[in-house]
From Swiss-Prot:
Subcellular location: Cell membrane
Protein's name according to its UniProt entry: Uncharacterized protein PM1437
InterPro entries assigned to the protein according to its UniProt record, in alphabetical order: DUF5389 (IPR035333)
Membrane-spanning intervals of the chain: 12-34, 49-66, 79-101
Keyword Acetylation: no
Membrane topology, record value: Multi-pass membrane protein
The keyword Protease belongs to this UniProt entry's keyword annotation: no
């Protein structure tokens, strides 16, 4: 009798990718907010542009990094875990920097 090699559930890494990609669900809200940034008198034109670009582009960056980490996890799991952790720290660092108005 042949032993089946099917996963029994989600691995810790799969949960990590799911949590890493969770902010993608807020993308419609980001698209709604981004045109209203122009109305904020405290932001310079450069800050408004950078915030708009961040709000429009972050889901693509998260999805690209998640896909890369998933593919790397098949061959080099420790490296993939490190990449996912470092990417999460970098994303949330940028998020707080942008949300704080670049101060």
């Amino acid at each position: 009798m042949e032993r089946e090699n099917k996963p029994k559930g989600f691995s810790g890494f799969s949960w990590g990718i799911a949590l890493f990609c969770l902010p993608i669900l807020l993308w419609p809200l980001a698209l709604t907010i981004s045109p209203n940034l122009l109305k904020n008198p405290r932001l310079s034109e450069t800050e408004t542009t950078l915030m708009s670009v961040f709000l429009w582009a972050y889901p693509f960056g998260l999805a690209l990094i998640a896909r890369l980490a998933y593919r790397l996890n098949q061959h080099k799991p420790p490296f993939a875990r490190g990449l996912l952790g470092l990417s999460a720290v970098a994303f949330y660092g940028m998020l707080f920097y942008v949300a704080g108005g670049f101060h």
